[in-house]
């Protein structure tokens, strides 16, 4: 599928803007800024200063250390190339989002010095919505999970910390980092919708396996035991004495006040996690009626990822066993029918937020032209859990990140990719079956792509390097 600049995700189209300075969310932002200032004289502050890069080469030493492979343009050209392209798309997406919203950086708002004062003047009037370090860190880490799945938890943890470092440095608010990571998930949709980019990722993974002397990852359909473990890469739920928990409380009370409104009615309906309901709420945004009869391949794909997303939260739910808000406060929810069944089920992360977000990511890859509408509905599906009283806000936020990590991991699993291919063919009106072909047949008949991932309608006529199948082709 050919994608253009106008297709690049804009956070403002499906995510909330910066918080009002009169809101509890801003109070949480300010508290996190103050925490960050306190961290600057510690070892975490030293790491934060090192993390504050703006170019791709600034991030690579971290991943090189994690993987035990020196990632450079000369040593790992395939890995470098795919990361370089990804960074370019991230820059465009961040710029597009900032054209919609301006948020003044913390150090500039308070007329203070940041952790890296040499660049303060340069970035003082550049919006921090969304956080570039959070976007880059989470995006590069999700892609590296596809290249190096054996290190997935360590990679994701480090990717999360890049955003945290920008808070410590005084360059981003906490809310900016949340937007940045969610935007990164949408960017993964964008690159996967370009078939040529998938070939570049495959070449990068093969290069990693060669350089690290590792065997390729076993093909198959991912089980939840192999999914990234959120206990290892996400922070624990907020402590009761923290400002973040105060924000959780504020969101819970605000959500409770909406239960008699139209948004409350939607939240009550969203408590339905049946396949029929999920398909119905995404059909409008998707642009086609999704059902077992009308779109059997898409339906099957949604069914599979819904279950996997739920399972991706299981380890963290059992590990933290966070008490749900309605149980903790001896309160009622908007949908009493599920209260008894979920009373002993851990609240963190939110399974509903996770599978809603993962379904949104998957449907957007099938129809990227509807990305903003689909992902906005996925976001609101998760927010309904706060209004309903079944989850705290931090549970829902963690659910989206868990889904993003699972989305990346799924893209190296052959059964998922085969079902995704069937779903895309079904959406385009072609046969839902996939004809078996030999490797030579596939390579010779495969379309050509530019190194930027743009599919060509015919064989290239201009000189340059192209991708066909899993191979580079040079047109002289």
Report the location of each language-model feature:
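Residue-level detector of functionally pivotal "anchor" positions at catalytic/ligand-binding pockets or at interdomain
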Residues: 430-452
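Surface-exposed, short loops/turns at beta-strand junctions within beta-sandwich domains
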Residues: 460-462
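Hydrophobic alpha-helical bundle signature of multipass membrane enzymes
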Residues: 3-172, 182, 190-200, 206-388, ...
């Amino acid at each position: 599928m050919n994608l253009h600049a106008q297709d690049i995700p804009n956070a403002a189209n499906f995510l909330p803007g910066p918080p009002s300075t009169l809101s509890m969310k801003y109070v949480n932002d300010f508290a996190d800024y103050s925490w960050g200032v306190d961290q600057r004289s510690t070892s975490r502050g030293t790491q934060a200063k090192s993390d504050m890069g703006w170019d791709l080469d600034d991030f690579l030493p971290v991943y090189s250390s994690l993987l035990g492979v020196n990632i450079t343009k000369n040593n790992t050209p395939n890995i470098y190339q795919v990361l370089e392209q990804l960074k370019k798309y991230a820059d465009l997406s961040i710029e597009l989002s900032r054209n919609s919203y301006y948020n003044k950086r913390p150090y500039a708002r308070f007329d203070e010095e940041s952790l890296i004062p040499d660049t303060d003047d340069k970035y003082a009037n550049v919006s921090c919505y969304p956080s570039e370090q959070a976007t880059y860190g989470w995006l590069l880490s999700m892609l590296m999970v596809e290249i190096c799945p054996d290190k997935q938890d360590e990679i994701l943890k480090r990717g999360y910390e890049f955003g945290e470092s920008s808070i410590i440095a005084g360059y981003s608010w906490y809310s900016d980092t949340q937007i940045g990571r969610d935007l990164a998930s949408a960017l993964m949709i964008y690159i996967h919708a370009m078939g040529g980019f998938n070939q570049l990722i495959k070449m990068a993974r093969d290069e990693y396996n060669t350089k690290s002397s590792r065997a390729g990852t076993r093909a198959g359909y991912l089980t939840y035991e192999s999914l990234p473990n959120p206990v290892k890469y996400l922070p624990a739920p907020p402590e009761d004495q923290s400002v973040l928990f105060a924000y959780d409380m504020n969101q819970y009370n605000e959500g409770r006040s909406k239960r008699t409104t139209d948004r409350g009615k939607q939240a009550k309906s969203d408590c339905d996690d049946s396949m029929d309901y999920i398909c119905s709420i995404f059909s409008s945004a998707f642009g086609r009626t999704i059902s077992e009869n009308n779109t059997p391949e898409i339906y099957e794909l949604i069914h599979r990822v819904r279950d996997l997303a739920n399972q991706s939260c299981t380890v963290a739910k059992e590990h933290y066993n966070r008490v749900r808000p309605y149980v903790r406060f001896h309160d009622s929810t908007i949908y009493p029918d599920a209260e008894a069944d979920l009373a002993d089920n851990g609240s963190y992360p939110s399974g509903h937020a996770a599978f809603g977000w993962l379904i949104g990511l998957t449907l957007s890859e099938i129809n990227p032209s509807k990305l903003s509408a689909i992902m906005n509905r996925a976001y609101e599906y998760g927010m309904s859990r706060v209004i309903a009283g079944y989850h705290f806000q931090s549970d829902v936020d963690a659910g989206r990140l868990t889904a993003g990590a699972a989305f990346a991991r799924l893209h190296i699993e052959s059964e998922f990719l085969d079902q995704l291919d069937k779903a895309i063919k079904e959406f385009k009106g072609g046969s839902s079956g996939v004809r078996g072909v030999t490797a030579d047949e596939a390579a010779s008949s495969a379309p050509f792509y530019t190194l930027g991932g743009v599919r060509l309608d015919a064989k290239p006529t201009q000189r340059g390097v192209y991708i066909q199948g899993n191979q580079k082709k040079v047109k002289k």
